[in-house]
Amino acid sequence: MSTGPIPPASEEGSFVSAPSFRSKQRKILHLLLERNTSFTIRSDFPESPKDKLHDSANLSILSGGTPKCCLDLSNLSSGEMSASPLTTSADLEDNGSLDSSGPLDRQLTGKDFHQDLMKGIPVQLLCSTPNAMNHGHRKKIAKRSTSAHKENINTSLKALEWEAPRTPRFRKMPGGPLTSPLCELEMKHLGSPITTVPKLSQNVKLEDQERISEDPMECSLGDQDAKGLSLRKMVPLCDMNAIQMEEEESGSELLIGDFSKVCVLPTVPGKHPDLKYISPDTVAALLSGKFQSVIERFYIIDCRYPYEYLGGHILGALNLHSQKELHEFFLRKPVVPLDIQKRVIIVFLCEFSSERGPRMCRSLREKDRALNQYPALYYPELYILKGGYRDFFPEYMELCDPQSYCPMLHQDHQAELLSWRSQSKAQEGERQLQGQIALLVKGASPQ
C-alpha cells in the first residue's frame, strides 16, 4: 500500500485520459482548454439565459462557423442518435466522441461563446422526451400536407411551427433558451435528425401555448364541429315555437275556416293574404258541375251596385251589396249540407274584387264567428273571385247574363252611384258605431 499522497479523483481522471486525447486531437484539446480558461477568467455571467443565447447567436453569425461540441454523432451512421445531455466539460473529456470535420484553424470570436452555448443547448436536450423526434416528424408531415391550404391557417399562429411536448418539466423551464436560432443552424449543419426546433414568439408565453392546438387547422375544424353540434342542439330549443307557428301558418293557408278540412277548390295568390282567392277558370268549372261530387251547394255573391249587376253578371249570382242583406240571407237561417261529406261554399266578387267583395266576405266571417264558438262556423269555406267580373267576363262571356259589362263609373249612372255610396257609407258608419258600443258594454260588464 503506497504511502504517498493520493491525488484527487478529478486529477487522476484527467491524468489518465489526457495523453490519449492529445494524441488523437491535439488542436481540439487546445480549443477545450481555451474554453476552460474563459470559465475561470470571466466572473460576471449574463443575467438571464435569454441574453446568453442572444449573444451566442450573434457570435455564431459573425464567426461564420458552428460549434460542434453539443451533440453525440457517433451513432449517426447506424440511424440512431444519443440524446444524453452534455452539461460539463468533464463529460466531454471522458468520451471524446465529438469529432470536427471542418478546418482545424476555425476559431470563434468571443471567449464567452462556449459558456453560453453549453448553458443554452442542454436545456433543450433536458426538455426533450423520448418521442420528441417522432413528434417533430409528424409536424413536418402535417406541414407538407397543409402547405396547399395556407390561406386557411390563422396568420397569428404562423410563428409557431413546432411545439415541444407538453410535459411538466417543459412547462417549468424558461422560454428564453428555446428562442435562439443557433440550435437550428447547428443541427442543420451537423445533419442531425432533429431538424426542427421551436420558434416561439417573445409575446407568447408557455402557459398560453398549452391552450393552442398543435395544428391550427385541427383546432378550427374541431371548433366548427363543436359549434355546429351546439347549434343543432339549440335550434329545437330556441326556435321550436317559431317553426311550429310557421308550419301552422303554411298549413292554415290550405285549410278552411274551422281548420277541419282542406280547401276543396284550388286557390291562387291574391291582394289580401288572409282571404282565399280562386281563378275565373275555377268559377267556370264550378258552374259546369265539375265539383258536384264534393260540393252540395254553392253561392256566388255579386257585391256590386244594382245598376252594375243589371248591366251584366255571372249566371246564378245573387246581388247582395249591403252587409245587412248579407247577414239576413245567410245567418237568419244558416244553410246546412244534407250530406256531411259534402260542403257549402260561397264565392264573393265585385268589379275588381279589390274592396267591396273582400269587405263583404270579412263581414260575414266576423258575424259567423260571433254566433259560434271558435273555431266552429256555419260557412267555413269562403272564396274571392280574383280579378272580379272584369276579368271573368272577357274569358267566359257565355256564362254571363246579359253578355255585357257595365262599369261602376259609367257616365250614365253617376246619380245612382252617389246614392248607393251614401247609403253604403251610412251603413258602414252605423256598423262601426255598433261595434264600439259592443266593446264598451263588454268592458263595463263584471268579469
From Swiss-Prot:
Residue positions, PTM Phosphothreonine: 66, 129
Main location: nucleus
Residue numbers annotated as active site: 350
Record field: catalytic activity: O-phospho-L-tyrosyl-[protein] + H2O = L-tyrosyl-[protein] + phosphate
Domain of life of the source: Eukaryota
Entry function: Functions as a dosage-dependent inducer in mitotic control. Tyrosine protein phosphatase required for progression of the cell cycle. When phosphorylated, highly effective in activating G2 cells into prophase. Directly dephosphorylates CDK1 and activates its kinase activity.
Similarity comment: Belongs to the MPI phosphatase family.
Any one Gene Ontology cellular component term annotated for this protein: nuclear speck
Stretch list, region Disordered: 81-109
Keyword Nucleus recorded: yes
Modification sites for N-acetylserine: 2
The protein's name: M-phase inducer phosphatase 3
Gene Ontology terms: biological process: cell division; G2/M transition of mitotic cell cycle; positive regulation of cell cycle G2/M phase transition
Enzyme Commission number: 3.1.3.48
Compositional bias annotation for Polar residues: 81-90
Keywords linked to the UniProt accession: Acetylation, Cell cycle, Cell division, Hydrolase, Mitosis, Nucleus, Phosphoprotein, Protein phosphatase
Organism (species): Mus musculus (Mouse)
Any one GO MF annotation of this record: protein tyrosine phosphatase activity
Disulfide bridge map: none
Post-translational modification: Phosphorylated by PLK4. Phosphorylated by PLK1, leading to activate the phosphatase activity. Phosphorylated by CHEK1 and MAPKAPK2. This phosphorylation creates a binding site for 14-3-3 protein and inhibits the phosphatase activity. Phosphorylation by PLK3 at Ser-213 promotes nuclear translocation. Ser-220 is a minor phosphorylation site. Phosphorylation by CDK1 occurs at G2 and G2-M transition and leads to increased activity.
Originating gene: Cdc25c
UniProt cross-references to InterPro entries, sorted A to Z: MPI_Phosphatase (IPR000751), Rhodanese-like_dom (IPR001763), Rhodanese-like_dom_sf (IPR036873)
Record-listed Phosphoserine modification sites: 20, 38, 56, 60, 63, 128, 192, 213, 220, 445
Tissue specificity as recorded in UniProt: Spleen and thymus.
Entry annotated with the keyword Phosphoprotein: yes
Domain Rhodanese residue range list: 294-401
